[in-house]
Amino acid sequence: YLYGRDDFIHWCISEIRGEIFPLLSAKDEVVLKIKQDEIDRYIEEKNETMFTSPMCGKVCGFVFADRFVSELGNRLCKMHPEIDFVAMIDIDGCTVSYRTVKEDIDLGKDVASLFGGGGHPKAAGSEFSQSIKLKVIEEVFE
């Protein structure tokens, strides 16, 4: 996602046509390291704000997040074996992304479907209405 999908595809195809396996340049390696550092910092920040609560008969970690949800969810679950899954709430996008690394839960069926969403056993999502954002504002400024 650093280069954009189309540019990346064209780059890969030209490398393959040149009969060389796509290799990253030193510049590419630096860019990837910078991006990985950004992701790592974001995960550490969100780890500090995560809270846990029961949900759907399991222990859920809750965090407000709008970026890097796959990396964030998987890493938080690995950092906190006491949680069964994590729910990442994107208040601006009105979405919730669910992630787990455990085998005994099907997030699509056991969690997301209860909130009008769906997905796979280890990755799922659901949406909520704009009115929820208004309720949050009312609660904060009440």
Predicted regions and their residues:
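Hydrophobic, aromatic-enriched interface-forming segments
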Residues: Y1-M50
